[in-house]
Amino acid sequence: MTFAHQILQGVTWHARQIPTRHEFHYPYRFWAVNLTQLADNPLPKVNMVASDVPKWLPQWLKKWLKKSLQQSLTIPLLSQHHWALYQFHQADYFAINRLDASLDNRLNASLGQPAPSASLLVKAQQTWQQLTGSQPTGEVVALVVLRNMGWYFSPVNFYIGFDANHQPSHFLAEVSNTPWNKRHYYGFLLTGEKTLYQHDKGFHVSPFNPINQQYHWRVEVHPKRYASANDNPEQNGFDVVIDIGLTDSRGKVFNAGVSLTGVQLDEASVMMSIKRRPCMSATSLLRIYWQAFKLYVLKRVPYQAYNQRLPQ
C-alpha cells in the first residue's frame, strides 16, 4: 500500500512574545507529492472549462473567462510537465545556487554532483544521508508549494520519510529567507507519529530575530486511509501538525506552525482548492511584507542585520 498524492489544507500561525506581542493566522495549503511513486503515478493534469468558472467571480470576469475558454477550449489548472496555474516544477526545489554559505560543504558537494538531472527524491535522500546519517527505507512525501502562474515562492517546504512499515522516520525542512533569497536545510529523525526535537538555529530567516537562538520542533504525522475508488486501490494518507518554537536568553521569543488536513489529490479536490485560493504565492508574499511593516513601523520591533547576534 502506498501514500496517495494529497492536498494538505488548513491554517498557518505566527505568535511573537518578545520584544512585543504580535499574532496572526491565515489559511494555508501544501501539495503533498509522493516522490517515490511519482514516476509511475504522476500528478493528474487538471483543466478548467467554461462550466467550471466559479459563480462568485465578478460578472465581467466570468464573461471574459467564459469567452476565453470557448475560444481556447481549456485553461490548465494543474500540471507536472507544462505551464499551468499551478505547476509542479522540480527545479524549484533544492536550488544549489541559493544554498546558504553556512550549510555543510559536504551537502553542497553531494547535491551539486547530480544536479540538475537527479530527481527530487534522490536529492532528498542525499540530504538526509548527510544531515542524519541515514535514509528512509520506505516512501518519501514532499510537502511543497507549487509554482503559481509561472512564479515560485515558498518560505518553507517539508519532506517526510517513512520506514518500510509506513511509519514516519525522517524529517527535512527546506527553509528560505525571503529578504536575502537564500536556502538552508534542517534534517532530523522522527520517532513515530509525534516527535519533539531541538537544536541551535543555523540560518538567519527573519530580520527581527538574531541568529543565536534555539529551535524547538513538534512534528505530528497522523496516518489515515483513503478508500478505493474508480478501480484504484486503497491508499495511505495523513494529516500533519508542524510547530516551531524559538527561544534565546530572554525566554520564549516566537512560535509558528501549520495544522493541515489531507484530502486525496484528484480533479475534484484540485478544482475546489484552487477556487478557494487561486493565487496563494502572491498572497503569502504580500502577507509577509504586511506583517513585517506592522512589526517594524507600527510596533517598533528593532531590525536585526544578517547573522546579527543577541548581546549576552
Briefly describe each language-model feature range.
Residues 1-312:
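Mature, function-bearing regions of proteins
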